[in-house]
UniProtKB/Swiss-Prot annotation:
Binding of Mg(2+) 2, residues: 298, 300
Superkingdom of this protein's organism: Bacteria
Binding site for ATP 1: 129, 169, 175-176, 208, 210, 215, 241-243, 284, 298
Regions that span the bilayer: none
Domain commentary: The large subunit is composed of 2 ATP-grasp domains that are involved in binding the 2 ATP molecules needed for carbamoyl phosphate synthesis. The N-terminal ATP-grasp domain (referred to as the carboxyphosphate synthetic component) catalyzes the ATP-dependent phosphorylation of hydrogencarbonate to carboxyphosphate and the subsequent nucleophilic attack by ammonia to form a carbamate intermediate.
Reaction it catalyzes: hydrogencarbonate + L-glutamine + 2 ATP + H2O = carbamoyl phosphate + L-glutamate + 2 ADP + phosphate + 2 H(+)
Keyword Transmembrane helix: no
Gene3D superfamilies in the record: 3.40.50.20, ATP-grasp fold, A domain (3.30.1490.20), ATP-grasp fold, B domain (3.30.470.20), Carbamoyl-phosphate synthetase, large subunit oligomerisation domain (1.10.1030.10), Methylglyoxal synthase-like domain (3.40.50.1380)
Metabolic or biological pathway, per its Swiss-Prot or TrEMBL entry: Amino-acid biosynthesis; L-arginine biosynthesis; carbamoyl phosphate from bicarbonate: step 1/1; Pyrimidine metabolism; UMP biosynthesis via de novo pathway; (S)-dihydroorotate from bicarbonate: step 1/3
Pfam families named in the record: CPSase_L_D2 (PF02786), CPSase_L_D3 (PF02787), MGS (PF02142)
Region Allosteric domain, annotated ranges: 948-1084
Sequence ranges assigned to domain ATP-grasp in this UniProt record: 133-327, 672-862
Native source species: Symbiobacterium thermophilum (strain DSM 24528 / JCM 14929 / IAM 14863 / T)
Protein name as annotated: Carbamoyl phosphate synthase large chain
Length: 1084
């Protein structure tokens, strides 16, 4: 059956910003879907608010709208573009919920838009807990005993009836948001109250707990004619009770008997048939390990996180096939692009083991509750492939980049036996390491199984690793022992640590012994058919399947798992680098381990290696590929930059900016000397290797000071301290300082922060744009609202920034990208830091300027000059030009009629016990973009897209630190003048009344009921403005207020600058005033 002819133009809804529970997998799925639809001759319109995605590039869809994903904005896009079809199942829960809202509001009917793919009735039956349960009963599929509740009282009544523990699952939410496991009445009331608030239909499912049962998933695909296949079975190592996004997952399932597999596979196919799914779908089961009994947990009637994993694990392009099914094609008509010969109706076969391990943000949020449950907490994930379970497991562990290359964990090793057993009993992010430690201490596999409910098969695999640790420690390192250790997944570094050798010495010995990895192919058919676009994984087996054709080739290092501080923005640059190398006639070879990303899609590069980003693993690929031009490190974030020096020392050429120049930018002493030579000021500071040295530096330069370890990224453990007592407390509590781990102490200037991204060839520098941060220095740049072009800088300040940026880029001989951050204090411009690599603002500037930074940087790295590429300040209409004897720098032309605002997005609701106050340490997980003719409208769009919905009337709570009171008075007066009611804590209320601003006093927690948290819970406060007093103790009023507000969906602003931005919007836009839309194609 050919594709349907009644549809020529299709609207695809993206998934918006990255939050916990919805990460890069939807950029990968959406990008693949847009390409698939255009292959079928359709015009594609896309709406997505996330500028960091490949999906929102101008060439991916015919019309790209980076606008808030709300019913009003999607309707405006539909009214303008008049698509005949809407594809909602590739934008995660956001896309699905939006389709439901548009249908219910009559928008789709009004504009004659047909829903493509899985019908709305099927979506509703899968997502609505009551309808789903009724359908399962109808087709004879077992579901746990449960109740649909719309009030906490109904949930408590069910709890009384069936007993605890019970699992709470809110309807239509993402990543288990608002859900949890209730062990008693108190927990039930808390979880259900929150869950009902977060469910768009105010509905929760409360079900009997199946804790301890195995969790098994099937990724299935069905077309409109009823043909269906299973693509992959997946088994969660963690039993039921831990969200699948937080579980270690193995594919294919390892512990099922053939009979169990056939029963569950048949059930999955029966369920999607009964639902009438058209496209990809994920079915989750609980399987009783002690009897042949199973329960259906839930169905995701859309492409999901598990789809991305199944897709990368099998080589089957799920999103592409789902998009083609949505426009009427059948499975037996869709060619599998991986093999080029088989069709999509062919079920994948796997002859290897795939493991996914989640990446958690607990290194950033040390106070967060690390217990894992039904509400997801991971920010990203890694995937590893090997022939054996232990081999894939250890490969995945070292892909996580948590400083551990094996199953040794100092914090776990320090636990006493009782605490270790508790760690085994309670699911948490360190349980894998606890299992290994328990085995080392002689705890048996049956005992660990009884405590953790982890299947003995997996425990035996971990036991094999522990046994090899012992064998390596006890005996000589023979060639036979080396080979067995490598087959179990041990890295050279892990072997070296056990036997007391340097990792490179282990490598040399291993190569002398002839113990080398081979590379195997992922091709979706276990080698039955030749693959047209293969990708590879390493293992210590016999036959090498990798083919490395001669010719020019270069390696692009990816950025690994998504985590706070290193997100999808870096994958964006790596993808553009791979594409541009191809265009230059250079074979692009990508190494990465993140299954969610576009960089690990089968057709992004010429060859893909799914490997950890460590020196050993990268060198193995370089050796396999033979004569390469070099490795590009500057697009993979800090992950790739950290490999530049070790690779260079190992004799591998690092392409782009010279290693020594990168060190000049990173090394404190050399960087200070560079700035001194160039006469460019920076805030005074120094390096300390002891507490007393830090105190001496602070006394010399004056308080407040910004202190941070010199060896971390993403602002980790960075803090502003205001006096000596705070400094001593920080040095004592936050970090271990020593001669090889110095602390940087800088004078903190409370000024405006500005940053630039530049591309340089060593002779010419293009400053792509100057971005102004709305929050003052002291809030991490990734957590600030950024505005382009600048709105408050003077012409002289802009000239100075262009001059400084040019001189720095030329002095460092930058070849490719460089990001420079400045602070303006007392009219003077100071350099804060220089990063000679791609930055998280590259996708944002690429979208709004039209200058494809990563592409141009790759052309420069490939050997072109900017002049050869046609970039010239005189011909390009440069906004500002600065010339020196060494070369010229110029500011890319700025739009006269547009302002762009990038706003951060946080995942506070998923992480309990985390302070929401902004600081020098980055906390946001994603970003959105608002673009319009002026700042208030662009800001409005960005705030709306980021989830900050401030009502045009209501009550504002002011509770601010003493040092902020004077400044807060002006803001409070503006809110009051706009008609808001002001309430404040005692000190702030007194200050407001002294300024004749009407304000009512409210109680702090310690002052008795009703206190501020009670008012928030009762819905009597609409906006909280709260700045940080000293200290972040979880028992302090400020912390409790901020957490209560976040958990009850009340917008909370912890920076007066953000509050000022909100006021700009409120005072400029009338309630209900319509704001226009524009497509990326119209911007430049």
């Amino acid at each position: 059956m050919p594709r349907r002819q009644d549809v020529e133009k299709v609207l695809v809804i993206g998934s918006g910003p990255i939050v916990i529970g919805q990460a890069a997998e939807f950029d990968y799925a959406g990008t693949q879907a847009c390409q698939a639809l255009r292959e079928e001759g359709l015009r594609v319109v896309l709406i997505n608010s996330n500028p960091a995605t490949i999906m929102t590039d101008r060439h991916v869809a015919d019309r790209v709208y980076i606008e808030p994903i709300t019913p009003e904005f999607v309707e405006r896009v539909i009214a303008r573009e008049r698509p005949q079809g809407l594809l909602p199942t590739l934008g995660g829960q956001v896309g699905l919920n939006m389709a439901m809202q548009l249908e219910e509001a009559g928008v789709l009917a009004r504009y004659g838009v047909r829903l493509l793919g899985t019908p709305l009735t099927a979506i509703r039956r899968a997502e609505d807990r009551a309808e789903f349960r009724a359908l399962m009963k109808e087709i004879g599929e077992p579901v746990p005993e449960s109740a649909i509740v719309t009030t906490p009282e109904e949930a408590l009544a069910f709890g009384e009836e069936v007993g605890y523990p019970l699992i709470v699952r809110p309807a239509y939410t993402l990543g288990g948001t608002g859900g949890g496991i209730a062990h008693d009445r108190e927990e039930m009331r808390d979880i259900v109250t929150r869950g009902l608030k977060l469910s768009p239909v105010t509905q929760c499912l409360v079900e009997r707990s199946l804790l301890g049962w195995k969790e098994i998933e099937y990724e299935v695909m069905r077309d409109g004619a009823g043909n269906a296949i299973t693509i992959c079975s997946m088994e969660n190592i963690d039993p039921v009770g831990v969200h699948t996004g937080d579980s270690i997952v193995v594919a294919p399932s390892q512990t099922l008997t053939d009979r169990e597999h056939q029963i569950l596979r048949s059930a999955a196919l029966k369920i999607i048939d009964a639902l009438g799914i058209e496209g990809g779908c994920n079915v989750q089961f609980a399987l009783n390990p002690h009897a042949r009994e199973y329960m259906v947990i839930e169905v995701n009637p859309r492409v999901s996180r598990s789809s991305a994993l199944a897709s990368k694990a099998t080589g089957y392009p799920i999103a592409k096939v789902a998009a083609k099914i949505a426009v009427g094609l059948r499975l037996d008509e869709i060619r599998n692009p991986v093999t080029g010969t088989t069709y999509a109706a062919f079920e994948p076969a796997l002859d290897y083991c795939v493991i996914k391990i989640p990446r958690f943000p607990f290194d950033k949020f040390t106070t967060a509750d690390r217990t894992l449950g039904t509400q997801m907490k991971a920010t990203g994930e890694v995937m590893a492939i090997d022939r054996t379970f232990p081999g894939a497991l250890l490969k995945a562990v070292r892909s996580l980049e948590t400083g551990r290359d094996g199953l040794f964990h100092p914090a776990v090793q320090a636990l006493d036996d009782q605490a270790l057993r508790e760690r085994l009993r309670t699911p948490n992010d360190e349980r894998l390491w606890a299992v290994a430690e328990a085995l080392r201490r002689g705890v048996t596999v049956p005992e660990i199984h009884a405590l953790s409910a982890i299947d003995p098969f997996f425990l035996d695999g971990i036991a094999a690793i522990v046994a090899m640790e012992r064998e390596l420690a006890d005996g000589p390192l023979t060639a036979e022992r080396m080979r067995r250790a490598k087959q179990l997944g041990f890295s050279d570094a892990a072997i070296g640590r056990i036997v007391g050798m340097d990792p490179l010495a282990v490598r040399r010995l291993r190569l002398e012994m002839g113990v080398r990895p081979v590379f195997k192919m992922v091709d979706s058919c276990a080698g039955e058919f030749p693959a047209a676009t293969p990708y590879y994984y390493s293992c210590y087996d016999e036959e090498n399947e990798a083919v490395s054709p001669p010719g020019r080739k270069a390696v692009v290092l990816g950025s690994g798992p998504i985590r706070i501080g290193q997100g999808i923005e870096f994958d964006y640059s790596a993808v553009h680098a791979a594409w541009e190398l191809k265009a230059e006639g250079i074979q692009s070879i990508v190494i990465n381990n993140n299954p969610e990303t576009v960089s690990t899609d089968f057709d992004t590069s010429d060859r893909l290696y799914f490997e950890p980003l460590t020196l050993e693993d990268v060198l193995n690929v370089v050796e396999q590929e033979g004569d390469i031009e070099g490795v590009i490190c500057q697009f993979g974030g800090q992950t790739a930059i950290n490999l530049a020096v070790p690779l260079s020392r190992a004799g591998v050429r690092v392409l782009g900016t010279d290693i020594d120049q990168m060190d000049r930018a990173e090394d404190r002493r050399r960087f200070d000397q560079l700035l001194s030579d160039l006469s460019i000021p920076r805030p005074p500071g120094g390096t300390a290797t002891s507490v007393e040295e830090a105190v001496a530096v602070a006394r010399r330069i004056g308080y407040p000071v910004l202190v941070r370890p010199s060896f971390v990224l993403g602002g980790r453990a960075m803090e502003i301290v205001h006096d000596e007592a705070e400094l001593r407390a920080y040095m004592r509590e936050a970090i271990a300082v020593s001669s090889d781990r110095p602390v940087l102490v800088d004078r903190y200037f409370l000024g405006k922060e500005v940053e630039v991204d530049c591309v340089s060839d060593g002779e010419q520098v293009i400053i792509a744009g100057i971005m102004e941060h709305l929050e003052r220095a002291g809030v991490h740049s990734g957590d600030s609202i950024a505005v382009y072009p600048t709105v408050t800088l003077t012409h002289r300040q802009r000239e100075t920034i262009v001059a400084y940026s040019t001189r720095l880029a030329l002095a460092l001989q930058v070849k490719g990208l460089v990001n420079i951050q400045y602070v303006i204090h007392g009219g003077e411009i100071y350099v804060i830091e220089v990063n000679p690599r791609s930055s998280r603002t590259v996708p944002f500037l690429t979208k709004v300027t039209g200058l494809e930074l990563a592409k141009v940087a790759t052309q420069v790295i490939a050997g072109h000059t900017l002049a050869e590429l046609g970039y010239d300040p005189d011909r390009s209409g440069a906004a500002l030009v600065f010339r020196t004897p060494a070369g010229a720098g110029w500011l890319w032309p700025e739009p006269a009629e547009r302002v762009a605002v990038k706003a951060p997005v946080f995942s506070w609701q998923k992480l309990t016990q985390v302070d929401t106050a902004l600081s020098p340490e980055m906390k946001s997980t994603g970003e959105v973009l608002g673009v319009d003719a002026d700042l208030p409208r662009a800001l409005y769009k960005a705030l709306l897209a980021s989830g900050v919905r401030v009502p045009h009337r209501g009550t504002v709570l002011f509770t601010v630190a003493d040092r902020d009171k004077a400044e807060a008075m002006g803001l409070a007066r503006q809110f009051s003048d706009l008609g808001y009611r002001i309430v404040a804590t005692t000190g702030t209320a007194r200050a407001l009344q002294a300024c004749a601003i009407p304000a009512e006093r409210v109680n702090k927690v310690s002052e008795g009921a009703p206190a501020i948290p009670d008012l928030i819970r009762a819905g009597k406060i609409d906006l909280v403005i709260n700045t940080l007093t000293r200290g972040r103790d979880a028992h302090r009023d400020g912390f409790i207020i901020r957490r209560t507000a976040v958990e009850h969906g009340v917008p909370t602003l912890t920076s007066l600058d953000t509050a000022r931005a909100v006021l700009t919007v409120l005072s400029s836009l009338r309630e209900g005033e319509e704001v226009g839309i524009s497509a990326v194609q119209d911007w430049v």
